């Protein structure tokens, strides 16, 4: 069987070696006589899986000791609703920087629980750039400042950590975590749905500075209390064990491949191939994003008309290049180049783009 190149924005492509290992271990895992999905999450066997996943993630991301790591069920949207409940006092403000669709989602989810203020909004400019941090309107007593590190739909990315003074910086890293080195100590909290760079859909990672867990937050059930999750090693309730196991395999694979430094090199090379095909097409392909904030993970582009967009998607699929249709909010084409996408995939896409232009340009 030949696997196609999957450019899906999420759930996204996973390393083939990880999938093969999971396949081999699905029915009977590690000599225990049962599948990993059948054993208790509180068994010594699974506790070892969970501990290894955290240890490897700490190594991969160089997570400082004064930061706690949680593995939570669900995705980033759930986390966005829980942030103000855990870290904002009743009536307190929180600042949000809106640089795309997911920044808008973050403030929407938080708004019922906090005085959510827009510190900067790139929508008026069409989400093609990121307002400089010096221009943001921050509330001096804000609970936190929230950014979306990489916008998968519009294709803009913070290339540097913004300076927000003494306010805790919270960031959604769902689509760019582990794609390049990151100084986590510059953040109060980062979070990520796993389904782009860390593993399968259905589990997320929250990394939080421990002193922030001392905040009283707002009245909430214990299941929504992050301090309780940390105290119970992410097992306050039954976790998604299969997802956690696959996340652990994926993180271990990234370490074996050379870690975030190596993936930063690979990702820059892959992105350069696709952006090179766009910029060298004489306007046949268009990416509207300011070059300094172009995403390396998600590259949207447009052809001269919607009919050509549709033809591009159809022909690329036939050529073994999957999931290139752009998000319904913006249309066009989108190529997602997460860590598990090999260089050969980016090269195949660039070659196809050149061939398509020769035939239809």
From Swiss-Prot:
Q: Gene3D superfamilies, from UniProt?
A: Aspartate Aminotransferase, domain 1, Type I PLP-dependent aspartate aminotransferase-like (Major domain)
Q: What is its EC number?
A: 2.6.1.52
According to the UniProt record, which cysteines are disulfide-bonded? none
Positions where N6-(pyridoxal phosphate)lysine occurs in the chain = 196
Instruction: Choose any GO biological process term that the UniProt entry carries and state it.
Output: pyridoxine biosynthetic process
Cellular component aspect of the GO annotation: cytoplasm
Subcellular localization, per the record? Cytoplasm
Q: In which pathway does it act?
A: Amino-acid biosynthesis; L-serine biosynthesis; L-serine from 3-phospho-D-glycerate: step 2/3; Cofactor biosynthesis; pyridoxine 5'-phosphate biosynthesis; pyridoxine 5'-phosphate from D-erythrose 4-phosphate: step 3/5
Q: Which reaction does it catalyse?
A: O-phospho-L-serine + 2-oxoglutarate = 3-phosphooxypyruvate + L-glutamate; 4-(phosphooxy)-L-threonine + 2-oxoglutarate = (R)-3-hydroxy-2-oxo-4-phosphooxybutanoate + L-glutamate
Entry-linked InterPro entries: Aminotrans_V_dom, Aminotrans_V_PyrdxlP_BS, Pser_aminoTfrase, PyrdxlP-dep_Trfase, PyrdxlP-dep_Trfase_major, PyrdxlP-dep_Trfase_small
Q: What does this protein do?
A: Catalyzes the reversible conversion of 3-phosphohydroxypyruvate to phosphoserine and of 3-hydroxy-2-oxo-4-phosphonooxybutanoate to phosphohydroxythreonine.
Q: How does it assemble?
A: Homodimer.
Know the name of this protein?
Phosphoserine aminotransferase
- Gene behind this protein: serC
């Amino acid at each position: 069987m030949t696997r196609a190149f999957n450019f899906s924005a999420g759930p996204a492509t996973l390393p083939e070696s990880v999938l093969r290992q999971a396949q081999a271990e699905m029915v009977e895992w590690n000599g225990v006589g049962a599948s990993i999905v059948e054993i208790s999450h509180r068994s010594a066997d699974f506790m070892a899986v969970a501990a290894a996943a955290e240890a490897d993630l700490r190594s991969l991301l160089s997570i400082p000791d004064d930061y706690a790591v949680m593995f939570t069920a669900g995705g980033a949207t759930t986390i966005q609703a829980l942030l103000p409940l855990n870290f904002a006092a009743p009536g307190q403000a929180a600042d949000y920087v809106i640089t795309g669709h997911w920044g808008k989602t973050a403030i929407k989810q938080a708004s019922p629980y906090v005085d959510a203020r827009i510190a900067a909004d790139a929508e008026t400019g069409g989400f093609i750039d990121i307002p400089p941090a010096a221009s943001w309107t921050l509330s001096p007593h804000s609970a936190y400042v929230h950014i979306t590190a990489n916008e998968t739909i519009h294709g803009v990315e913070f290339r540097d950590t913004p300076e927000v003074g003494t306010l805790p910086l919270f960031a959604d890293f769902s689509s760019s975590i582990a794609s390049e080195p990151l100084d986590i100590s510059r953040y109060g909290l980062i979070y990520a749905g796993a389904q782009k760079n860390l593993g399968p859909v259905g589990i997320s990672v929250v990394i939080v500075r421990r002193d922030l867990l001392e905040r009283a937050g707002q009245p909430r059930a214990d299941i929504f209390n992050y301090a309780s999750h940390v105290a119970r090693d992410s097992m306050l309730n039954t976790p998604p064990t299969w997802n956690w196991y696959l996340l652990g395999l994926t993180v271990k694979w990234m370490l074996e491949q050379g870690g975030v430094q190596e993936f930063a090199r690979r990702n820059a090379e892959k992105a350069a191939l696709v952006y090179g095909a766009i910029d060298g097409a004489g306007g046949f392909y268009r990416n509207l994003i300011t070059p300094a904030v172009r995403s390396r993970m998600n590259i949207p582009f447009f052809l001269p008309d919607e009919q050509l967009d549709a033809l591009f998607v159809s022909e690329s699929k036939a050529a073994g290049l999957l999931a290139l249709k752009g998000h319904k909010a913006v249309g066009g084409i989108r190529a997602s180049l997460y860590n598990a996408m090999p260089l050969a995939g980016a090269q195949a896409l660039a070659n196809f783009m050149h061939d398509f232009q020769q035939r239809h340009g």
